[in-house]
Swiss-Prot record:
NCBIfam families: ispD, ispF, PRK09382.1. InterPro entries: IspD, IspD/F, IspD/TarI, ISPD_synthase_CS, MECDP_synthase, MECDP_synthase_CS, MECDP_synthase_sf, Nucleotide-diphossugar_trans. This is Bifunctional enzyme IspD/IspF. The record marks R16, K23, H243, T342 as: Transition state stabilizer. Pfam families: IspD (PF01128), YgbB (PF02542). The record marks R139, K191 as: Positions MEP for the nucleophilic attack. One of its GO terms (molecular function) is 2-C-methyl-D-erythritol 2,4-cyclodiphosphate synthase activity. Residues 1-210 are annotated as: 2-C-methyl-D-erythritol 4-phosphate cytidylyltransferase. Residues 211-371 are annotated as: 2-C-methyl-D-erythritol 2,4-cyclodiphosphate synthase.
Length: 371
C-alpha cells in the first residue's frame, strides 16, 4: 500500500454561497461540513497524515485531535502550498471539503490507477450542448474536473513553486509537463458552491441540539458621559467606567453569545489593551461578535437579560432596549426579554456604586434546509 497523506481545503470565504454561515461550517447532524467530508475520505485509507486548511484553527481544533491544521492563504493555491509544507509522503490526495459525498467507488478508482501518471483526477463528461461566445464547443473534448485528486508530492510542490494561480492540482502539474490520468467522476462529487446546490445533494440535516450561554458583566459609575444600555441612552451623565462606551448590557450579551458558541469571551475578542476599541460602540461590537458566531453555523433562538441596578429606574427603557437588540442582531423581538431589578440596597449595587447585567442565550445550528 502506497504511503499517502490527505489535504482537505477548508479555508475559503464562501463568497458565492451568499449566506451568513460559511458553507464549511454547515452542520450535517452534529458535524460541521468540513469534518463530515474529512471523516468520509479518511475512512477509505490509512493516510499517513491528514492536514486541514483553516480560517479558524482554534475553533476547528475543538472537534478532533487526529488532524493537523494550518492557516489558509488568500487563494486555493496559497492554501495548498502552505499545507504541502507539512507533507513528506510519496503521494498526496487533495480535496475540497465542499465535495462532501465522495464515494468509496470513486476513491477506489483513483487508487487503482495510482501508477498511471503524475496526477490522477476524476472528471465528468459533458452531456449538454456547450457554447462559448455563442459558438458550439466539441463537448466530446470537454471534461469537468473534480476532486479528490492524487499527485506525486514532490512534483506538486514543484508545480506550486511557480507561484502561478491554478484552480486545481492537475492543471498545475500539467503546466510542468506532468502526465495526467483521468478516471470517471460522479455526480455526488459535485462541489457545493451555491446555496441552491444544497437541494441537489442528499445531505444529513442539522441536529436539533440547543446550546446555552451565560454572560455576566459589572461596571462602576463614575464617568461624566451618557449611560448606555443596549445602545439606548438611559441618563445623560451617569456613565460607567470602561475602555469602550461602557454599555454593560451589550458586554454581558456578547459574552453569552460567544460562550454558547464556544468562541471564548469578549476580552479575547476585544481586549481593553487595544486602543482601537477605546470608546467603541459596544452594540457594533456585539453585532460583529454575532456575525462570527453565525459564520461557524449557529443562530439565536432567544435572549433573556437581567439588569441589576439600584438607580436609575429602567422600567421606561426596557421596550427600547429590546427593540434595539432585535434590530442589531436581526432577531424577532418576541425572542428577546429584558428584566430589571434592584438588590434591595444591598452591596455595591445597592450603594449605587455600579451596575451589573446577567444575560442568557440559546443557540441552535443554522437550519440550511430553509434556504
Amino acid at each position: 500500500m502506497s504511503e499517502m497523506s490527505l489535504i482537505m481545503l477548508a479555508a475559503g470565504n464562501s463568497t458565492r454561497f451568499n449566506t451568513k454561515v460559511k458553507k464549511q461550517f454547515l452542520r450535517l447532524g452534529n458535524d460541521p461540513l468540513w469534518l463530515y467530508a474529512t471523516k468520509n475520505l479518511s475512512s477509505f485509507y490509512p493516510f499517513k497524515k491528514i492536514v486541514v486548511t483553516s480560517s479558524n484553527i482554534t475553533y476547528m481544533k475543538k472537534f478532533t485531535k487526529n488532524y493537523e491544521f494550518i492557516e489558509g492563504g488568500d487563494t486555493r493555491a496559497e492554501s495548498l502550498k502552505k499545507a504541502l509544507e507539512l507533507i513528506d509522503s510519496e503521494f498526496v490526495m487533495v480535496s475540497d471539503v465542499a465535495r462532501v459525498l465522495v464515494s468509496k467507488n470513486l476513491f477506489d478508482r483513483l487508487i487503482e490507477n495510482l501508477d498511471k501518471a503524475d496526477c490522477i483526477t476524476p472528471a465528468l463528461k459533458v452531456a449538454d450542448t456547450t457554447l462559448f461566445d455563442n459558438e458550439a464547443l466539441q463537448r466530446e473534448k470537454i471534461k469537468l474536473i473534480q476532486t479528490p485528486q492524487i499527485s506525486k508530492t514532490k512534483l506538486l510542490k514543484k508545480a506550486l513553486d511557480q507561484n502561478l494561480e491554478f484552480t486545481d492540482d492537475s492543471t498545475a502539474i500539467a503546466a510542468m509537463g506532468g502526465k495526467i490520468w483521468f478516471v470517471e467522476g460522479e455526480e455526488n462529487a459535485r462541489k457545493l458552491t451555491f446555496k441552491e446546490d444544497l437541494k441537489k445533494l442528499n445531505l444529513p440535516t442539522p441536529s436539533f441540539e440547543i446550546f446555552t450561554g451565560n454572560g455576566f458583566d459589572v461596571h462602576e459609575f463614575g464617568e461624566n458621559r451618557p449611560l448606555l444600555l443596549a445602545g439606548v441612552q438611559i441618563h445623560p451623565t451617569m456613565g460607567l467606567k470602561a475602555h469602550s462606551d461602557g454599555d454593560v448590557l451589550a458586554h454581558s450579551l456578547t459574552d453569552a453569545i460567544l460562550g454558547a458558541a464556544g468562541l471564548g469571551d469578549i476580552g479575547e475578542l476585544y481586549p481593553d489593551t487595544d486602543m482601537k476599541f477605546k470608546n467603541a460602540n459596544s452594540m457594533e461590537l456585539l453585532k460583529q461578535a454575532y456575525d462570527k458566531v453565525r459564520e461557524i453555523g449557529f443562530e439565536l433562538i432567544n435572549i433573556d437579560i437581567c439588569v441589576m441596578a439600584q438607580s436609575p429606574k429602567l422600567k421606561d427603557f426596557k421596550q427600547a432596549m429590546q427593540s434595539n437588540i432585535a434590530h442589531t442582531l436581526d432577531l424577532d423581538e418576541f425572542r428577546i426579554n429584558v428584566k430589571a431589578t434592584t438588590t434591595e440596597k444591598l452591596g455595591f449595587i445597592g450603594r449605587k456604586e455600579g451596575m451589573a447585567v446577567l444575560s442568557s442565550v440559546n443557540l441552535k445550528y443554522f437550519d440550511w434546509t430553509r434556504l
